[in-house]
Amino acid sequence: MRSPAQRLEKILILKPSSLGDVVQALPVLRLIKRHLPASEIYWWIDSNLAPLLEGDPDLAGVVRFERRRWAAPCHWDEIWRSVRWLRQQAFDWVIDLQCLMRSGVFAWLANGKLSIGLDEPREGARGFYDHIVRRPSALTHAVDWYLSVLPVLGVPVNWDFQWLPERPVLAASVRRQWPVDGARWIVLQPGTRWASKRWPVEAFAGLVPLLASANSGFRFAILGGEEDRPLGEVIARADPARCLDLTGRLSLPEMVEWIRLSELMVSNDTGPMHVAAALGTPVVALFGPTEPRRTGPYRQLDHVLQLNLPCVPCLHRRCAYSKPFECLRAITPAAVFEAAQRRLAPTASAGLR
């Protein structure tokens, strides 16, 4: 009988989006590869996020999925080519960590010897899997829930490693392109997809002078996409000499490197926050309508700021109250400053929840 290290399994992981969800699923990849180093693993992912995984040493390939083309007849030929490719691969395991109709259909079309999904399938995806893994409890963190598929496959869950591998060439490129050296960096992430998860930009701007006055050697890098440029401009005006507005200016891998080289991130509940947790970069996370015990920065939950209001967590994209977003608006820059200082202090161990 072959030892686990000699077993050659061909595996497809389906987790196309979002950034935070993909990052939280990476320990599944790492542990499979550690336990079965001869395995051949592919990851099915939205094209916008593919650069995060392309070149990953644990992957045999990245399968790009154009979500916007899913229902467009003019792209059906391309979709069928993807389907034929899936059928030809003869996967041993198909692991769907997305559990939506699209991913469920592709899990079924892949025709693996064993297909696995999670116990919260939406859009009727439940029928596409041979085995469904239940969430251990209502408050089980997403990372631990994803990892719970591994015992079904005979893969032990014991780990302590960085989820995102170092990219020395890219890191050197970032240092050449931006004035990284000669300063210590705090990264700020003001944007989110949900307006209800966004700490007010004025509060971020008010935080900058507090941190600047107490930390003379630090500068501030403001992260975000093109849509976050207005937020970056407001925050950068708080201290133009020490703020570097990078909103809309970085590729996804470059953003990862900026978070890697920084000593602290202050962030809303959004994808880059999970990148920081994956890299081990200290985080102060600002939560309103969502549940940090399920989706907070993994292994850094003591450093989440969330108010104890009757409506929290509501899990709504829009606030139903007359004073909208009070759950985040009532978090003061002074409170975030105090939490940040504890994270920056060499002997800090206390957090705030």
Residue ranges of predicted features:
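Catalytic machinery of carbohydrate-active enzymes
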Residues: 1-353
